[in-house]
Amino acid sequence: MKRFLMMMTLIGLVGNWNSTLTAQLVSPDSLYLNEDLPEINIVAVKPLIKAEADKTTYSIAEDPDSRTYTLLEMLRKVPLVTVDGEDNVKVNGQSSFKIYMNGRPSNMFSNNPKEVLRSIPASMIKKVEVITDPGARYDAEGVSGILNIVTKGAEFEGYNASIKTTVMNLFKSVGGFATLKYGRLSLSGNYTFSQQSSESESDYLRTQSEDGGKLRMLSDVDVKYPAHYGSLEGSFEIDTLNLISLSGNLNIGNSNSIWNSHYSRLDKEGEEIYAYNEDMSKKNEWGSASLKADYQRLFKRNKEEMLTLSYQYDYIPNDIYSVFYDKDKMGNVSLPQLEADYTRQISHARTHEHTAQLDYVNPFTSIHSIEGGLKLIRRSSTSHATSEVKELDEGVWLPADLQPLVEYRHVQNICSAYAGYGFKYGKWSLNPGIRMEHTWQDVTYKQGEGKDFNYRVTDWVPSWTSAFRLDDRSLFRLAYNLRLRRPNISYLNPTVFVSGTSISYGNPGLVSEKHHRLSASYSYYGTKLNVQASVLCTLGKGVIDEYLFIDSANVVNSTYDNLVDVKAAGGNLYLSYNPSPRTSVSLNSMLHYLDLRAQEGNEVYDTDVRNSGF
């Protein structure tokens, strides 16, 4: 007779029985089990930060704080991103960066970006990518880099919806986020209404180097910002190789501000030349709306080979309605702007932007890859502004003597092509690339003073990134790129805005800034300790700067020009430590040395004018 020995083992339990069985079926003896292990908890911390050759990624969705925080609050945790006490966002210590949504430039951040970031709940964001060294496939604009915000889609079959409200001293919002996935169709949508208020006081004193005179302005400002933000995204998977995506974003709002100011002009002896008080009410209605369509094609021979066709339309309105009341005039106030008690200025600006893009990427071996693409952007901006005055509260509005009407059109076309190569072998990776951007723009004045002009330029933008991965958690990176900063319509608009004895206007003759950047960084991201340290050098030519001057009529003029050359060197340090699953400590710091010098050949500053320091 054959005999069999059966042993039974259960995790966490120990048995004290075994039985010898024959081929004949028999009933086994009683089985006794005792507990062998006490209760245990296995806790794994998923890394929130990932360092790659060309970017650093923070996983917002994996951070528990994303359930209650806004996107602006979460940015305080992202390496190389700083948010100051007034909620101004900087990347690599600079505010001249571009914000992308899902890998594409987004114009909804062009007006009041911090208000938009505050209105977006972090629960709808998947991750934030900090691209400090953009490669050839990215637009050349954005001096300090690109902040790419990747939103969540519908990840699971079915639907999900959430509602959120935020109440703070000067800010409140309410909104919702919903997703739907049904077979090959995915939809997600978001809407938020926000209301912010701010009150501030300022004391401004300016000394003129030419005559030693002084200009002083005391102001009390009360501003309210109601805004609406919404987005809708959808995708349909035709088959395993073809995907169609549609999306739209809407961001509209207005700011209502009340200014109470006191202006005074003093000579070098401290004697008052003139003084007056001014009350100003201003309403600014702004917004952006965008529609985007993408077609993505994968190839059977290599599922990582991809062709993408994209089209995007953006509409950006900006209307300003201002009324000034000048009173309590003392001294020499015979300036044209102050002859009337009331001044009214109305400005209507519109921008229509069309973008078509083709991208191709092919990692044809495990070591080598290539990418390339074409892009065409057409921006058409119009501005219509009027300026009127009247003597008394019940008087009739009449055209102002100083630029009563200006109407002009600004058309900008940017055609670009790029090519890049990728090499990855073992722990080494290398990504050189080149991008060509040809810009041509035309400015036409339909009414008012102004001379038509056009501008043509071709920029070659090289980029290079190399990386060495020391192990699974640490990475060393060295990179160089050239970045551009093009002036937007607010810098170019020649419309004169009058405020008492001050006027401000744009300069349609501005050209793009160029910034060369060289950086080196080390990253270590573990389960508890995260470190990213970087050093960088920047050389900027023809940086756009605002400058003020007082003309012969004692009027303060404010405008812009390509005036400054910048040299900068510094470092950034990011540290975060998680001693326990519920405790975290982080440090996001930077130290930069700046050397600012007047550009040779400029007509505003002497060439020996400079400023430097940390």
Model-derived features: positions:
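Short, acidic, small-residue-rich periplasmic hinge/interaction motif at the N-terminus
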Residues: 25-64, 84-86, 92-96, 131-133
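N-terminal periplasmic accessory domains that precede
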Residues: 71-74, 113-115, 130, 140-163
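Extracytoplasmic beta-strand/coil segments of soluble accessory domains associated
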Residues: 72-108
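Outer membrane beta-barrel strand-and-loop segments of large Gram-negative receptors
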Residues: 218, 353-355, 399-405, 505-507, ...
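Transmembrane beta-barrel wall of Gram-negative outer-membrane proteins
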Residues: 170-197, 213-259, 287-291, 297, ...
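Short acidic/polar hinge/loop motifs at secondary-structure boundaries
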Residues: 71, 77, 104-132
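Face-selective signature of the C-terminal outer-membrane beta-barrel domain
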Residues: 229-231, 235-253, 280-444, 469, ...
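Surface-exposed extracellular loop regions of Gram-negative outer-membrane beta-barrel proteins
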Residues: 440-442, 472-517, 537-558
